[in-house]
Protein backbone atom coordinates (compact mmCIF):
# COMPACT_ATOMS: atom_id res chain seq x y z
CA UNK A 1 0.00 0.00 0.00
CA UNK A 2 2.83 2.37 0.80
CA UNK A 3 4.42 1.84 -2.61
CA UNK A 4 1.16 2.46 -4.34
CA UNK A 5 0.75 5.79 -2.61
CA UNK A 6 4.25 6.88 -3.57
CA UNK A 7 3.78 5.86 -7.17
CA UNK A 8 0.52 7.72 -7.39
CA UNK A 9 2.13 10.87 -5.99
CA UNK A 10 4.94 10.69 -8.52
CA UNK A 11 2.43 10.37 -11.32
CA UNK A 12 0.55 13.43 -10.11
CA UNK A 13 3.77 15.47 -9.92
CA UNK A 14 4.71 14.47 -13.42
CA UNK A 15 1.31 15.61 -14.67
CA UNK A 16 1.76 18.99 -13.07
CA UNK A 17 5.12 19.31 -14.82
CA UNK A 18 3.53 18.72 -18.21
CA UNK A 19 0.89 21.36 -17.49
CA UNK A 20 3.60 23.95 -16.67
CA UNK A 21 5.43 23.21 -19.92
CA UNK A 22 2.22 23.53 -21.92
CA UNK A 23 1.36 26.83 -20.23
CA UNK A 24 4.80 28.25 -21.06
CA UNK A 25 4.48 27.25 -24.67
CA UNK A 26 1.18 29.16 -24.90
CA UNK A 27 2.69 32.61 -24.02
CA UNK A 28 2.29 35.40 -26.63
CA UNK A 29 5.27 37.34 -28.00
CA UNK A 30 6.41 40.03 -28.46
CA UNK A 31 5.56 41.39 -25.06
CA UNK A 32 5.21 45.17 -24.60
CA UNK A 33 6.18 47.43 -21.72
CA UNK A 34 5.73 51.19 -22.06
CA UNK A 35 8.17 53.81 -20.77
CA UNK A 36 8.13 57.57 -21.41
CA UNK A 37 10.30 60.37 -22.79
CA UNK A 38 9.61 63.99 -21.83
CA UNK A 39 10.96 67.48 -22.57
CA UNK A 40 9.63 70.87 -21.45
CA UNK A 41 10.18 74.11 -23.35
CA UNK A 42 10.00 77.67 -22.06
CA UNK A 43 10.03 81.03 -23.80
CA UNK A 44 13.30 82.04 -25.44
CA UNK A 45 15.65 84.41 -23.64
CA UNK A 46 16.92 87.85 -24.67
CA UNK A 47 19.55 86.47 -27.02
CA UNK A 48 19.38 88.21 -30.42
CA UNK A 49 18.55 85.99 -33.38
CA UNK A 50 21.08 86.67 -36.17
CA UNK A 51 19.91 87.78 -39.63
CA UNK A 52 19.01 84.89 -41.93
CA UNK A 53 19.33 84.65 -45.70
CA UNK A 54 16.09 86.21 -47.02
CA UNK A 55 16.19 83.89 -50.04
CA UNK A 56 16.57 80.78 -47.86
CA UNK A 57 15.63 81.82 -44.30
CA UNK A 58 17.31 79.03 -42.36
CA UNK A 59 18.20 80.16 -38.79
CA UNK A 60 21.04 77.60 -38.69
CA UNK A 61 22.79 79.36 -41.58
CA UNK A 62 22.79 83.12 -40.81
CA UNK A 63 24.19 85.87 -43.05
CA UNK A 64 26.43 88.83 -42.25
CA UNK A 65 25.26 92.14 -43.81
CA UNK A 66 27.91 94.74 -44.64
CA UNK A 67 26.00 97.70 -43.19
CA UNK A 68 23.41 96.68 -40.58
CA UNK A 69 21.48 99.56 -38.96
CA UNK A 70 22.19 98.07 -35.53
CA UNK A 71 21.58 94.96 -33.41
CA UNK A 72 18.12 93.43 -33.21
CA UNK A 73 15.75 94.10 -30.34
CA UNK A 74 16.25 90.74 -28.62
CA UNK A 75 13.59 89.07 -26.49
CA UNK A 76 11.20 86.19 -27.06
CA UNK A 77 9.32 88.30 -29.64
CA UNK A 78 11.81 90.35 -31.63
CA UNK A 79 12.75 92.32 -34.71
CA UNK A 80 16.12 90.78 -35.53
CA UNK A 81 17.16 92.83 -38.53
CA UNK A 82 16.04 95.38 -41.10
CA UNK A 83 17.82 96.46 -44.27
CA UNK A 84 18.86 100.01 -45.03
CA UNK A 85 17.33 101.33 -48.24
CA UNK A 86 20.01 103.05 -50.31
CA UNK A 87 19.07 104.97 -53.45
CA UNK A 88 22.59 105.97 -54.37
CA UNK A 89 23.84 109.25 -55.79
CA UNK A 90 21.63 110.73 -58.50
CA UNK A 91 21.82 113.69 -60.89
CA UNK A 92 19.51 116.59 -60.07
CA UNK A 93 16.57 116.55 -62.48
CA UNK A 94 13.63 118.85 -63.14
CA UNK A 95 11.54 115.90 -64.39
CA UNK A 96 9.65 113.44 -62.21
CA UNK A 97 11.95 110.56 -61.33
CA UNK A 98 11.65 107.17 -59.65
CA UNK A 99 14.75 105.73 -58.01
CA UNK A 100 15.24 102.16 -56.81
CA UNK A 101 16.90 100.90 -53.63
CA UNK A 102 20.01 98.75 -54.00
CA UNK A 103 19.95 95.15 -52.75
CA UNK A 104 21.36 94.27 -49.34
CA UNK A 105 25.08 93.45 -49.59
CA UNK A 106 26.67 90.71 -47.49
CA UNK A 107 30.28 90.44 -46.33
CA UNK A 108 30.76 87.34 -48.49
CA UNK A 109 30.09 89.46 -51.59
CA UNK A 110 26.57 88.20 -52.24
CA UNK A 111 23.58 90.50 -52.75
CA UNK A 112 20.20 89.74 -51.25
CA UNK A 113 16.71 91.25 -51.44
CA UNK A 114 16.11 93.91 -48.82
CA UNK A 115 14.03 92.64 -45.91
CA UNK A 116 12.96 92.80 -42.29
CA UNK A 117 13.15 89.80 -39.96
CA UNK A 118 10.87 88.86 -37.03
CA UNK A 119 11.26 85.95 -34.60
CA UNK A 120 8.61 84.61 -32.22
CA UNK A 121 10.00 82.13 -29.70
CA UNK A 122 7.46 82.75 -26.93
CA UNK A 123 5.87 79.33 -27.42
CA UNK A 124 2.32 80.65 -27.01
CA UNK A 125 1.02 81.00 -30.60
CA UNK A 126 -0.44 84.32 -29.43
CA UNK A 127 0.30 86.17 -32.67
CA UNK A 128 1.88 89.54 -33.47
CA UNK A 129 1.69 92.49 -35.86
CA UNK A 130 4.46 94.32 -37.75
CA UNK A 131 3.90 97.86 -39.00
CA UNK A 132 5.98 100.48 -40.80
CA UNK A 133 5.99 104.26 -40.37
CA UNK A 134 7.94 107.22 -41.76
CA UNK A 135 7.75 109.96 -39.11
CA UNK A 136 9.19 112.71 -41.33
CA UNK A 137 10.00 113.49 -44.96
CA UNK A 138 13.49 113.08 -46.43
CA UNK A 139 15.63 115.96 -45.20
CA UNK A 140 19.17 117.29 -45.45
CA UNK A 141 21.35 117.58 -42.35
CA UNK A 142 20.21 121.21 -42.12
CA UNK A 143 16.52 120.32 -42.33
CA UNK A 144 15.69 121.09 -45.98
CA UNK A 145 12.85 118.78 -47.10
CA UNK A 146 12.62 116.81 -50.31
CA UNK A 147 9.05 117.96 -50.86
CA UNK A 148 6.66 115.42 -52.37
CA UNK A 149 9.05 112.46 -52.19
CA UNK A 150 7.27 109.15 -51.60
CA UNK A 151 8.58 105.71 -50.65
CA UNK A 152 6.79 102.63 -51.97
CA UNK A 153 7.59 99.02 -51.10
CA UNK A 154 6.44 96.42 -53.64
CA UNK A 155 6.73 92.67 -54.27
CA UNK A 156 6.60 92.11 -50.52
CA UNK A 157 6.11 88.58 -49.23
CA UNK A 158 6.58 86.50 -46.09
CA UNK A 159 9.05 83.62 -46.09
CA UNK A 160 10.25 81.10 -43.50
CA UNK A 161 11.51 77.55 -43.03
CA UNK A 162 8.55 77.00 -40.69
CA UNK A 163 5.54 75.01 -41.90
CA UNK A 164 3.34 77.05 -44.26
CA UNK A 165 0.34 76.65 -41.96
CA UNK A 166 2.00 79.09 -39.52
CA UNK A 167 2.42 81.82 -42.16
CA UNK A 168 1.17 85.26 -41.01
CA UNK A 169 -2.47 85.62 -41.97
CA UNK A 170 -2.11 89.07 -43.54
CA UNK A 171 0.90 90.12 -45.62
CA UNK A 172 0.84 93.48 -47.41
CA UNK A 173 2.38 93.07 -50.86
CA UNK A 174 2.65 96.85 -51.33
CA UNK A 175 3.13 99.70 -48.86
CA UNK A 176 3.13 103.37 -49.90
CA UNK A 177 4.32 105.65 -47.13
CA UNK A 178 3.09 109.11 -46.30
CA UNK A 179 5.40 110.99 -43.91
CA UNK A 180 3.76 111.41 -40.52
CA UNK A 181 1.20 108.62 -41.05
CA UNK A 182 1.86 105.78 -38.63
CA UNK A 183 1.33 102.04 -38.51
CA UNK A 184 1.13 100.92 -42.13
CA UNK A 185 0.51 97.18 -41.88
CA UNK A 186 3.33 94.94 -43.10
CA UNK A 187 2.45 91.56 -41.58
CA UNK A 188 -0.29 90.46 -39.21
CA UNK A 189 0.14 87.06 -37.58
CA UNK A 190 -3.13 86.28 -35.89
CA UNK A 191 -3.47 83.65 -33.15
CA UNK A 192 -1.96 80.26 -34.04
CA UNK A 193 0.38 81.80 -36.68
CA UNK A 194 3.72 83.58 -36.93
CA UNK A 195 5.77 81.18 -34.79
CA UNK A 196 9.50 80.95 -35.47
CA UNK A 197 11.59 83.21 -37.72
CA UNK A 198 9.90 85.04 -40.61
CA UNK A 199 11.29 87.48 -43.16
CA UNK A 200 9.28 90.21 -44.88
CA UNK A 201 11.23 90.53 -48.11
CA UNK A 202 10.87 92.75 -51.15
CA UNK A 203 11.29 90.28 -53.98
CA UNK A 204 12.37 86.67 -53.58
CA UNK A 205 15.91 87.23 -54.89
CA UNK A 206 18.32 89.94 -56.07
CA UNK A 207 16.79 90.11 -59.54
CA UNK A 208 13.20 90.64 -58.38
CA UNK A 209 14.39 93.07 -55.70
CA UNK A 210 15.94 95.49 -58.22
CA UNK A 211 12.84 97.67 -58.64
CA UNK A 212 10.90 96.54 -55.58
CA UNK A 213 11.62 99.49 -53.27
CA UNK A 214 10.94 102.80 -55.01
CA UNK A 215 11.48 106.46 -54.21
CA UNK A 216 9.44 108.87 -56.32
CA UNK A 217 10.70 112.45 -56.44
CA UNK A 218 8.67 115.15 -58.26
CA UNK A 219 10.53 117.22 -60.83
CA UNK A 220 9.24 120.42 -59.24
CA UNK A 221 10.85 119.61 -55.87
CA UNK A 222 13.84 121.77 -55.00
CA UNK A 223 16.91 119.55 -54.69
CA UNK A 224 20.15 120.62 -53.07
CA UNK A 225 23.45 118.92 -53.90
CA UNK A 226 23.45 117.21 -50.53
CA UNK A 227 22.45 113.93 -48.95
CA UNK A 228 18.82 113.51 -47.88
CA UNK A 229 17.75 110.91 -45.36
CA UNK A 230 14.66 109.73 -43.52
CA UNK A 231 13.94 107.43 -40.59
CA UNK A 232 11.82 104.32 -41.04
CA UNK A 233 10.22 102.80 -37.95
CA UNK A 234 9.32 99.12 -37.87
CA UNK A 235 7.05 98.42 -34.89
CA UNK A 236 6.26 94.94 -33.55
CA UNK A 237 3.19 94.47 -31.37
CA UNK A 238 2.15 91.49 -29.27
CA UNK A 239 -1.42 90.63 -30.20
Residue ranges and their predicted role:
Residues 4-7, 21-239:
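Signature of Gram-negative chaperone-usher
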Residues 9-17:
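Bacterial N-terminal signal peptides
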Amino acid sequence: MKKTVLLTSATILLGVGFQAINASAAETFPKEYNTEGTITFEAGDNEITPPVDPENPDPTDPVDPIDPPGPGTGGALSIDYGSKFKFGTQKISTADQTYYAAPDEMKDGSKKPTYVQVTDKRGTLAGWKLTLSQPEQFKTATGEELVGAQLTFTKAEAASMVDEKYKPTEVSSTISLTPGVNNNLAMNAKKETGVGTWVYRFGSNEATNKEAVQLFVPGKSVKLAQQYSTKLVWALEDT
